[in-house]
Amino acid sequence: MNTANDIDRLYNAIEINEKTFQFFQIDLQSYGIQEVNKGSTQFFYILLEIMNGKFNCNLVFIVNCYDELGKIIYSNERTVYVDTYIGYDTLKFWCNDTNLIDRTNKIRVFVRKG
């Protein structure tokens, strides 16, 4: 079930570590939350739209979810391969765990060398 309150709360919880994107000269064009589901296993998607970039290695984009105490309760990553990246991509992260929507207080997104 999609609830506007959960979508808004999760979207507002996203923090982008801009320094890591700037290091690789990647422009984050847009991001969002999609398909919030509070079934038996709660899940949602985080979407990132990226452009440009100057790098000569594979990059790993990481999404970490934190609880109200600041503990990491979930992590997911996607790799962008230097050989296939043409200057634009949309990355989709599936975040799923028991009560993950209710437990997530902050979401941090960053990029590192792969």
In which residue ranges do the predicted regions lie?
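Short edge beta-strand/loop segments characteristic of extracellular beta-sandwich folds
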Residues: Y45-M51
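Short, cysteine-centered beta-strand-loop-beta hairpins and adjacent loop/turn segments enriched
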Residues: M51-N56, E68-I72
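Transition segment at domain starts
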Residues: M1-Q42
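A short beta-turn/strand-edge loop motif at beta-sheet boundaries
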Residues: N52-N58, L100-R103
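Short, hydrophobic/aromatic beta-strand segments
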Residues: N56-I62, Y74-E77
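Short, solvent-exposed, Trp/other aromatic-anchored flexible loops in extracytoplasmic proteins
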Residues: L69-G114
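Conserved aromatic beta-strand anchor motif in extracellular beta-sandwich/beta-rich domains
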Residues: V63-D67
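Hydrophobic core residues within well-ordered beta-strands of beta-rich domains
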Residues: Q42-F44, L59
